[in-house]
């Protein structure tokens, strides 16, 4: 059972996990772990399932998925019957009113929907993956020089599950460098997997870029793929100015993660998020929601 902190009710909700039995089997049973290492974590598995989700045959999965996870389609730009396939639904866009944004210069917003963890004063060689597990930022982006600039800074981990809105956005106005791709495996990013695979973020497929923001300095954006996420699509134009809240890109089917690194003393994350992280809980947030300030 995964408990998530709800900022509105100040209580904990139990996360509905898509494919929970499969995840438990793959990461907690001897046979499942063997199958995971031999096949599930490999590109071929995610590619095959991704091809299915791109096909018209997958369209019939949409309504059942919406009903099972109680997804509010009134926030979506399309009706159910307008989606061409499951990936079209999965990467759905929302109405502008669905995710209000505070455009105040001193306010930091969430880059997407998901479950947020915040770690302050980070050690580059011991960045927290989940309580009890760490990884190296230098290894994550394969660029020690860039990584060193974020020593003592703040790390935000936004975990998306398959039921979430899967587009990610810019947290401020500014310009972003071209995204650098790093090949890797396709482990799940569910906490069950994070508790069973050391340095998971450094093993999975990922992309990173430097966003030069107007109000929070240089921000390191990292997008991490996961099981069945065969594609991370960047929709922004490198070095072209963007506005706060504009789309940066999106993930195709599967759970996935966005990680942001801020330099030391450039932001202050809201205290409830920091406190819940220390207690071992993620906080549910939506794109555009205020999560910190200068």
Curated annotation (Swiss-Prot):
The active site is at 113 (charge relay system), 169 (charge relay system), 256 (charge relay system), 256 (schiff-base intermediate with substrate). The record marks 255-256 as: Cleavage (non-hydrolytic). The modification Pyruvic acid (Ser) is found at residue 256. Binds 1 pyruvoyl group covalently per subunit. Its cofactor is pyruvate. It catalyses: a 1,2-diacyl-sn-glycero-3-phospho-L-serine + H(+) = a 1,2-diacyl-sn-glycero-3-phosphoethanolamine + CO2. InterPro entries: PS_Dcarbxylase (IPR003817), PSD-B (IPR033177), PSD_type2_pro (IPR033179). One of its GO terms (cellular component) is plasma membrane. Keywords: Cell membrane, Decarboxylase, Lipid biosynthesis, Lipid metabolism, Lyase, Membrane, Phospholipid biosynthesis, Phospholipid metabolism, Pyruvate, Zymogen. Heterodimer of a large membrane-associated beta subunit and a small pyruvoyl-containing alpha subunit. This is Phosphatidylserine decarboxylase proenzyme. It comes from Clostridium perfringens (strain SM101 / Type A).
């Amino acid at each position: 059972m995964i408990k998530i902190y709800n900022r509105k009710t100040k209580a904990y909700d139990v996360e509905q996990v898509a494919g929970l039995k499969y995840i438990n089997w793959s990461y907690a049973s001897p046979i499942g772990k063997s199958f995971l290492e031999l096949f599930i974590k490999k590109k071929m598995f995610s590619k095959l399932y991704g091809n299915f989700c791109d096909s018209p045959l997958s369209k019939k999965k949409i309504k059942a998925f919406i009903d099972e996870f109680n997804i509010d389609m009134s926030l979506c730009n399309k009706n159910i019957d307008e989606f061409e396939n499951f990936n079209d639904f999965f990467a759905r866009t929302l109405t502008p009113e669905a995710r209000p944004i505070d455009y105040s210069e001193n306010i930091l917003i969430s880059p997407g929907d998901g479950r947020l963890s915040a770690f302050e004063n980070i050690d580059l060689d011991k960045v927290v993956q989940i309580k009890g597990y760490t990884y190296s930022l230098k290894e994550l982006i394969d660029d020690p020089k860039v990584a060193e600039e974020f020593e003592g800074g703040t790390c935000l981990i936004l975990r998306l599950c398959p039921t979430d809105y899967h587009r990610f956005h810019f947290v401020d106005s500014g310009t972003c460098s071209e995204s650098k791709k790093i090949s890797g495996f396709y482990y799940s990013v569910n906490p069950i997997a994070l508790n069973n695979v050391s340095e998971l973020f450094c093993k999975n497929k990922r992309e990173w870029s430097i966003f030069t923001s107007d109000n929070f300095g240089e921000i390191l954006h990292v997008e991490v793929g996961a099981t069945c996420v065969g594609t991370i699509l960047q929709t922004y134009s490198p070095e072209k100015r963007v506005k706060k809240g504009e789309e940066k890109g999106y993930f195709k089917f599967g759970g996935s993660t966005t990680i942001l690194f801020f330099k030391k003393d450039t932001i202050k994350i809201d205290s409830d998020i920091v406190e819940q992280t220390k207690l071992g809980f993620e906080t549910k947030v939506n794109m555009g929601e205020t999560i910190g300030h200068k």
